């Protein structure tokens, strides 16, 4: 009991010795080498508990996007690694030590390389800002308080009430990471991510467009991507700030298209839904006069709905379709698929190589539109 109370005292003495600015801005007790070690342990846990999707071409494609973003705008010295988590839930997250993750479900919902670059830039920014390490430090503070409560309870005969408070381990650390960041951290990651996209040659409007579409989807389904909840009053302001900064960046340089065809082509064969569903993504090239409903009847499994096709492609069920459009569709394993008439090039329409940076690459951006 004495050692636990001493630990609490030492911890809070350390907190009180920190400058006010460090406490206000968020601080971390984790060194960079500690982040790398912890990131490796968390990566093992994620792989063991959730599993990774390792199709070589898709993995190489996603890794190339992350490398391009890191070269353009990340100030950290980590070796960044990106992995595809083999689950249907729509999410992307970063841990510590340069580990970035995107789920199968998120890849399904994105519509272009530029949107994926925006999501990855946002997560890389959380690593650059050490947001996860700060979360871990806060969690440790709560854990130390919990240990103090155990010791105090023991002196009062109530120790059994605290038996569930285990020391902060890897599982607890992962739970902390998967929880939402505070609004300030999300705004800063948006800001840095948008600038990183522009520096890498990606149109920053892609991230703003995705955030807006995701908010609409959350209203319909109740499913959310961390830090973006449609019921929060700050969400609309956050999206508006992202759109304003994206337009400001676009006014300073030109960008190529979003890379929709190249992105969708890389998704062909990606499992859809839960692993046991035995469904996968395919592409369908629209012919003159076709509707979403007629395409569903023509090529999709009976259990798939018109709404599902529309949602995958961010359309409404009665939207008119242009001949030649490429739609993402869901088919059963082994089901023959009508292939697009033209040969698709997985590099066609990819954004151009990055232009010269807009500013010093190691500067953490802060502007009038996306500041705290």
Predicted regions and their residues:
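Bacterial N-terminal signal peptides
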Residues: 2-17
């Amino acid at each position: 009991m004495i050692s636990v109370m001493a630990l609490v005292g030492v911890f809070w003495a350390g907190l009180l010795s920190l400058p006010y600015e460090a406490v206000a801005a968020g601080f971390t007790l984790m060194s960079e080498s500690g982040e790398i070690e912890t990131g490796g342990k968390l990566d093992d846990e994620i792989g063991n508990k959730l599993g990774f999707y390792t199709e070589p071409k898709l993995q190489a494609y996603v890794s190339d996007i992350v490398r391009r973003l890191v070269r353009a705008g990340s100030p950290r010295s980590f070796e960044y690694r990106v992995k595809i988590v083999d689950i249907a839930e729509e999410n992307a997250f970063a841990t510590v030590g340069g580990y970035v993750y995107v789920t199968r479900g998120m890849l399904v919902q994105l519509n272009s390389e530029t949107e994926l670059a925006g999501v990855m830039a946002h997560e890389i920014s959380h690593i650059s800002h050490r947001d996860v390490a700060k979360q871990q430090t806060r969690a440790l503070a709560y854990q130390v308080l919990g240990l103090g409560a155990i010791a105090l309870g023991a002196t009062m005969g109530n120790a059994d009430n605290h038996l569930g408070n285990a020391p902060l381990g890897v599982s607890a650390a992962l739970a902390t990471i998967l929880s939402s960041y505070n609004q300030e951290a999300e705004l800063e990651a948006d800001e840095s991510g948008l600038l990183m996209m522009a520096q890498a040659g990606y149109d920053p409007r892609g991230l703003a467009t995705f955030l807006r579409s995701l908010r609409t989807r959350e209203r319909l389904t109740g499913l959310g991507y961390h830090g973006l909840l449609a019921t929060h009053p700050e969400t609309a302001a956050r999206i508006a700030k992202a759109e304003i900064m994206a337009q400001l960046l676009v006014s300073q340089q030109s960008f190529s298209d979003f890379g929709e065809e190249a992105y969708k082509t890389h998704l062909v064969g990606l499992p859809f839904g839960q692993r046991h569903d035995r469904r996968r993504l395919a592409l369908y090239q629209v012919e003159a006069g076709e509707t979403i409903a007629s395409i569903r009847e023509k090529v999709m499994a009976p259990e798939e709905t018109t709404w599902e096709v529309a949602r995958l492609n961010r359309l409404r069920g009665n939207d008119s379709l242009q001949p030649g459009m490429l739609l993402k569709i869901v088919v059963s394993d082994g089901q023959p698929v009508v292939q697009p008439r033209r040969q698709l090039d997985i590099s066609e329409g990819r954004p151009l190589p990055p232009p010269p940076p807009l500013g010093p690459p190691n500067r953490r951006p802060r502007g009038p539109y996306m500041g705290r």
